[in-house]
Amino acid sequence: MRAVHFGAGNIGRGFIGSLLAASGYDVVFVDVNEQIVRLLKERGEYRVIIAGERQEEQWVRGVSALNSQTERDDVIEAIASADLVTTAVGPHILPVIAPVIAAGLERRFTVHQKPLHVIACENMIGGTETLKQHVVTHLSEAGRQLVEECVGFLNCAVDRIVPNQTNDDPLAVTVEPFFEWAIETKNTIGAVPPIQGAHFVADLGPYIERKLFTVNTGHALAAYLGYQKQYRTVQEAMKDSGIRESVEQALRESGAVLVKKHGWDEQEHRSYIETTIGRFTNPSLSDDIVRVARSPIRKLGPNDRLVAPAVQYYTLFERVPSGLVKGIAALLLFDETGDAEATALQQTIEQSGVEGALVQYAGLDNSHPLVVAVKEEYKKMQKEQ
């Protein structure tokens, strides 16, 4: 079996590529990083370090690589003969790789029409559907018809902490032990692709929301509260008992929303929260706070990790969620000068106040009780700075 994987970065090598290789695929990485592509070609293997209580090493073998800029024709041929195509490139790169994927599919259809699955493993909702929309704009009319018949674009949710890192060996990558790869089956063509460690689900929605309202919510709180106390990493911040309690409180609140909405077992979800807290406190990882906190305007969005669970909590329980409110207030104080969104956010607050920022970016009415609560918490945090 052959898998073509776009994105030979840390997530591509340390998560998706390693699982595909373990599942029996010959993995062809596609990237524009000349050094990484050259080393993967030369060695055909790389090392993954699992940073748990005890450090483990795994060797990923039987891999190769292509440069999508200088070896475009080879990438097209690889797609034409692939059994699976996956990506881990970042949402903004999906439209960039769409033309070569489309060309590969057109070439494939001239040779055979065997089923193919495409899975975009991106930190976004509906990533594969988004990729499909970009791909079809580059297909012929006949190609579009054959895509509907022969290619299954499967949405997925992925979760593994792969921190920023610098290794002596450019191919080596450190990852946390935990991972989750949930793949939605509704667009499957024939049998689901064999992927060791992935689980296939009929409805991805609850899995995406569970991750967003737990992992992303908790991560954001630790980062924004940690930034206020000038901690460098999430792991350092989580050693602060006050920050840890605030994170746990917020996850109890978002957890109450999830349990109520989806009818989940409360104890099972509590266990998931405990696992998540354990991931944030893993001493073998170093999660840079500024990296986790970046893009605060996006993270303040009405459907994102802080405002969405806070609004739903208030709607369901008619109480203000104090932990989530703390997280939103801390986000509004994030003023990292190297972050364009942080700069824009601070300018909005200066011009329109906290209420103006929450109306503009979070989609809240300025009379909403959450706005009042966040404003109070914001003032309190300002005094403590």
UniProtKB/Swiss-Prot annotation:
Its EC number is 1.1.1.17. InterPro entries: 6-PGluconate_DH-like_C_sf, 6PGD_dom2, Mannitol_1_phos_5_DH, Mannitol_DH, Mannitol_DH_C, Mannitol_DH_CS, Mannitol_DH_N, NAD(P)-bd_dom_sf. It is an enzyme of class 1 (oxidoreductase). NAD(+) binds at A3, V4, H5, F6, G7, A8, G9, N10, I11, G12, R13, G14. It catalyses: D-mannitol 1-phosphate + NAD(+) = beta-D-fructose 6-phosphate + NADH + H(+). PROSITE patterns: MANNITOL_DHGENASE (PS00974). GO terms for molecular function: mannitol-1-phosphate 5-dehydrogenase activity. One of its GO terms (biological process) is mannitol catabolic process. Gene3D superfamilies: N-(1-d-carboxylethyl)-l-norvaline Dehydrogenase, domain 2 (1.10.1040.10), NAD(P)-binding Rossmann-like Domain (3.40.50.720). One of its GO terms (cellular component) is cytosol. It comes from the Bacteria. Keywords: NAD, Oxidoreductase. Belongs to the mannitol dehydrogenase family. PANTHER family: ALTRONATE OXIDOREDUCTASE-RELATED (PTHR30524:SF0), MANNITOL-1-PHOSPHATE 5-DEHYDROGENASE (PTHR30524). NCBIfam families: PRK02318.1-2, PRK02318.1-3, PRK02318.2-1, PRK02318.2-5. This is Mannitol-1-phosphate 5-dehydrogenase. It comes from Geobacillus thermodenitrificans (strain NG80-2). The lineage of its organism: Bacteria, Bacillati, Bacillota, Bacilli, Bacillales.
